[in-house]
Amino acid sequence: MLGRMSLRHAPRRVRPLFLGSAALALLACGSPATPEAAGKPAEGGTPAPTPAGPDAPAAPTPSAPTPPAEGPTATLRTGSFAPATMDALTGSIVHNLSGDADYYELEFTLPSGDGRTAVVAAIDGEAAALVAVRHEADRVRVTMRRPIPSKALSTSLAGTVWFRGYEGQNQRWFAAPFTATGTPTKDAELPRRFAEVLSNQLRSGDDGPRSPFHHFAAGRIHAALGSGAAAPATVLAEARARETSTDLSQLMYTTTAATSLHEALQYEKGLGLAGTTGKRDVAIETVAGPALADHPFEAMRGGLSTTTPPSEEPLAAAVPADFWYVRFSDIRDMLRILDEASTWITPVAHAMEERPLVRDLAERYQRELGLGRSGLAKALGHTAVSRLAITGSDPYLRDGSDVTFVFEVASQVVFDAELTKHLTRWQTEIPGVARAEVIHGGHTITIHADPLGQVRQHRAQVGNLAVVSNSEAACKRVLDAIDGRTPKLADEPDLRYMLAREPGTHDAFAFIGDKFVAQVVGPKQKIQQARRMQAAAELATPGYAALLYGWLHGRAPASTAELTAAGVLVPAELAHSDGAAIEFTPGAPARSSWGRADALRPRIDLPEVTKVTAAERDAYEQFSRGYQDYWRQFIDPIAVRIDLEGDTASIDVRVLPLIEGTNYRDVEDIVGKQRVVVPAIDDGLHAVWAVGKDTRLRKELDRMSTAFSGKADLGIGWLGEWVMLGTLDRTALTDAIALFDDDVQKPLPEWPDEPAIAKALGKLPVFAAADVNSTAGLVAALAALRVMSNEVAPGAITWENVATHRDVPMVRVGIAPTAGDDVRRFADSVAVYYAQVGGAIVFTLQQSTLEVLIDRFSDETRRPTAADTGGAQLVVEGHVRPQGGGWTALLWALQGQAQIGQPAARHYAEAILRGDPSVATDAARFRALSLAYFGGVPVTPEGRADYGLRPDGVFDPIHGSAIHPAFPPLPVADDTPIAALMMRLSSLRASVSFDDEPTSATPATRSLHTRFELTLGAAAE
């Protein structure tokens, strides 16, 4: 039925369409310098000498039209959404036990049949107590652990139990106040039962993913509260059956499975299950990586048709061949990007990824490098630095990686003064920063570092090149590249090919080459990174133990001795599995030779992997086979070119080759080799796909449509070279979202009836269009469709010419007045309008939308056209008017996306607030403790860390708690990251093409070419 369709969460499903622009805006930067006018990259098919983007034939974006008269933008249902109140419960205090802590067990009998489940409970006046709930049939047991024993036995307790259930069609919370009285009997088993119930709650909440701490605590709580006993045999058996710690193949997928693996590892550590991988007696040389070949890049260069000289990347001569590389022509561009990233790009990307923690990587790496962003650097940096490159040896920036800057110095005096100023600032903030020197290859490397590794600047000078790194090994590798002692990126054939394929100068250029990818997926780095992940879990354990101590005792621990005495930390956990010692002081990050819990030592600075275990070898080989299934034959480079001019940022990305089994291959199945030129639009959002003549999808759709209808005419043989889907920028978009969304507003008391849903959908300004290559075929198909509809539902559907616009007839297909009652009630709500105009057929839900599309398609310069070369194969473009329907819909979508990660963020906040109650009134201490124990800080959708704890759980002042949420008007404030984005983003255009490369390889090599153009407003001062 229409009313029970999955439309309720439709806004969440379409968010990626709205939100892709946020991630792409990473490279936009305010008011950048004008790029040089050299040739732009070639697009489309075999590389051509004439630079042309995929959209090159498109006319410039027309000025935005005057918006039509519309109704008001929909209003969100704002305010607090309190739990529904249940009848009060009366129960008994059945058991208790006193000792180092007080335990009480309460029991309540519930009315049967309401379908609600008890989830959370709180006891009045017991803020420091831990309370666990078990719901069994018609009984609820509430168990409390009071960390500080009272002198008198409690014979009366009051509080609240919160239930999950349904009210009408809405899931919601219910609050049941309770009182429990009686004289309890002592029960020595009460701590064990409490540990079992709390362990289950810590691992399996229904309000979002739990943190790794919760998994550790779920395992360790048994030993901490069960008189030193281990977890029940059934729990241990279940954990051993999973064998997560020894399933090293999962650890090889370090970039995709880190969080879930960390949680599983911590649960096993909490249970005391120590995974072993055996003796390291297998030579790394015997572990084979993926059998992937290099492209014949030199021969491919010879096949290029361009006569334009290749671009130059002089700083690539200072970078090792197996490092990633980013170059900026002007330091001001880089500084603008960093400022934009701090203001809104990183927070919005964080929301899109649904990550619960903000790691503040920019601040971390600035501190490690001894660098900073001052007003003087932004104003005068270009006089000190001609250009700069940033490079590194691996992609593990979140965990901890090497980052090296190579500055081409224009004024040594200004440059030295600026770096000295920044280093002095860090020496003031970080105690113990000392100076040292090492000599490498005749060069002096000056090191400034503190004992904890928070600052570790390595600096060297070679001619006019200044090298600044956070890694000694990386600094040495860069010096070796400069001196020619190691292969340099500038000499690599893949980079030389990319620079020759698309010559021209650009404001910024980024490159990932064959050798970098080969190192990342090779056995040395993969096995080393897997060991780092295990070491990171071991470094996190003391901090988690300190938090668990606070949960159980109502205060933070004073020493590690308290942790071991309380049973929350095993002395052996102050060492890694490889024997390396772990130093830990409660309140600070644990540290060892592997680094700190909040920032691991760069992988390149660790001892090289020479021997591995048989388990590590087998795990890597399993990973290698899976990797090779995607990259069938070759590993290839990725090049990114960035140009900034005025308020527009252009990002051009080329990836070689297409990856088997991915969404890109799915798109290629649709488009084939067909291309389309798509003129710019000035209103709304649309996506245009080229449709290849002989693609498998076209043939399959044609076969299915004729087979389904039984009519030969009802196929898609009339379909031309492109199809389009889109929407105009109208307030009706907000009407539909306001009806269905329950992420950014209070839910409706009752789900709307079907006519109301149909009416909202029928007002949407959406459209579909398709190129027509056979008018006769289209007429036959429409006639066949009309006959079929009358056969299926006689007299229920009407087809009528309702009007003309620009002399183009418009047809309305709707529900007839003579239709049955169950259908006729939708007659005034839903209809489809269509017209054939400009060689295309257009379908809409509103006549006014169709008229706009007729205006657009009547102008041949504004409609897509097929192309043999140039153009693109997929184009997406969107424009938003400030405060308009699309703008508001995007705002709501961003806010809803930001709130998806809040359940997990609240769990992290709960871990800190219960682990050290003193941080509730000290925001700086909250952030510091979160960084020390988690390596990041949980933040609200507004980027704040102002969480608090109350009986119904963790809350923030704007959005409330999970049990008692609040829904503020949007935007929440002008200084939030989402508001900053909405003030900046004006339009986005993305194009995708699959281009042939000049190679004799079989099958023929095709690259993925993507181009983004973003238009941004002025940055706030």
Question: What name fits each language-model region?
Answer:
Residues 2-19:
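Bacterial N-terminal signal peptides that target proteins for export
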Residues 30-33:
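Bacterial signal peptide processing site
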Residues 26-28:
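C-terminal motif of bacterial Sec signal peptides marking the signal peptidase cleavage site
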Residues 62-904, 910-920, 924-1021:
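Signature of soluble extracytoplasmic/periplasmic domains of secreted precursors
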Residues 20-24:
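Sec-dependent N-terminal signal peptides
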Residues 35-66:
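Low-complexity, Pro/Thr/Ser/Glu-rich flexible segments characteristic
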